[in-house]
Amino acid sequence: LRDIIITNGYPRDVTDQDFIAYRASMSSIMTRMMLLDSIPSVKIKNYAYRNKGNLKFDEVTEAWGITEPSFSNGAAYADLDNDGDLDYVVNNINDSASVFRNNVVQQKPHESNYLKVQLKGGKDNVQGYGAWVEISYANNQKQVYEYTPYRGYLSSVDPTAHFGLGKTQTVKEVKIIWQSGKGQIFKNVKANKTLLVEEANAQVLPTAKEAMSAPLLADVTDILN
C-alpha cells in the first residue's frame, strides 16, 4: 500500500490574515520588498501518513522520525542502501537536504518482503513511462502501479516499480500493460528480487469480457430545459 508524505512547501505564508490586514494598511507607505520581508516565516515539520487500506490513513509523523522543522518543497524516494525498502530524500529551501533511512527491514525482517519491477521499453519510450503494473498475491490482495517517476516539485524517484509485500514470499501473478497495449504475465514470482521486464517480449493479451454496468453520468439536458 502506498503511504503519503507531505512537505510543507512555503517559507512565507502569504495567506496569513494578520499580514493581509497589515499589507492593506501599510502598502501606500512601504516598498514591495519591505512588505515581502514582513510576511511571517515559520518553519514547520512535514507530515507522514501510513496507508491502512480501505482509503484510511494513520498520521505517523512522529513515529517515523520526521520531526525537524523545515521549508521543504520537493521529495523523492529510492532504495538507497539496496536492502529492499524505500528510503526518503527531501529538499529544503536555503538549507541542506534531509535523507531518511528506512529501517523496517532491520526491525521486522520477516514482515518486510518486497518485489521490484524494472521496466525496459522500446526505443520511443525506453523507461516505459505510463506502463501499468499489477500484482496479485495472498488473500486476493492486489497492488497496482502506473509508472511515472515524478513526485512533487522538480523531484523524480527511482525508476523501478516497488511493491511492499509484508509476510508474502511469493507473488501469484505480475501483469504488465505497456503503452503500446501489449502486455506480459508472470506467475509465481518469488519475493525479494528485481524482475526485469522488456517490452520487446510483450504480446497482445486476451481480455475478459466484462458485464456492462449503468454509466456514472446520465444526460438530463432535456429534463432541465
Residue ranges and their predicted role:
Residues 10-40:
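Short, conserved, GDST-rich strand-edge loop motifs in beta-rich repeat architectures
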Residues 2-3:
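Active-site regions of oxyanion-processing enzymes, predominantly non-cytosolic
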Residues 41-52, 56-72, 76, 81-225:
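Gly/Ser/Thr/Pro-enriched helix-cap/hinge segments flanking short amphipathic alpha-helices
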Residues 6-7, 90:
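Residue position within the beta-strands of beta-propeller blades
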Residues 7-8, 177:
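Conserved residues at the C-terminal ends of beta-strands
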